[in-house]
Structures are given as structure tokens and as C-alpha cells.
Amino acid sequence: MDVRAYLNLVRESGGLVSHAHPFHEAGYIPYIRLLPHHVDAVEVINATKPPVVNERAAAYAASYGLLTTAGSDCHSSGARRLGGIEVKRRLTSIGDLIGVLRQGDFRVFLNVKD
């Protein structure tokens, strides 16, 4: 299935698509691919990426009116930088998370441990 068709299927089925670290560059990624009309949100804070990459993602999200998300991308303990979203109530299901994101009732954050 084509990636656009897959993303559309997720959204048509009630899911929410957030594009994680859209400007990440690595040897195993042949090119940066942006699909602003097929996603709902963009990860604008990734704790492991340089600020310029996060700033680029934030500008991308803003230019298309997309929701924003954040994450740590932490694959080991002892991370010095942590990112995520803060919500006002306890979430008990994926449906709760999707609802909070769609309503914009959250804030993204980045914490740096000294």
C-alpha cells in the first residue's frame, strides 16, 4: 500500500497521524519526505535532535496549521534531555490521547537535566 493511502486509511479510521522527526537525516533515510496533507501533527520537539531541526519542524507545522507533538526519542536510561506533551487530566486510552491532541488541550515541552 502506498504511504499516502496508508496515512489516509489511518485517519479515515479515526486515528491520528503525527510525523515524528520530519527533518531527521541519516544514512538509512534516502531523502526527507513531507506529507502535510496526509498527517494531523508534526513532532516539533525531539529531545535528541539539534535545535535547528526542531525549529524547522515547528515552522513546517505552523505553515500548514498542523498540531504539534514532542518526544524524547530516548533509547536508553539516563537521558539528559526529555521531551513530551503535558496534559491536564489522566489519559486512560488511546482514544483519550487522540481527543486531547485533536482538541489542542496540551502543551509540548523540553526538559534538560543539569
Model-derived regions: residue spans:
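Binuclear metal-dependent hydrolase catalytic cores centered on His/Asp/Glu-rich metal-binding motifs
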Residues: 1-14
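Charged catalytic cores and adjacent phosphate/nucleic-acid-binding surfaces used
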Residues: 8, 16, 25-114
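Short, well-ordered beta-to-alpha junction loops that form the rim of enzyme active sites
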Residues: 21-22
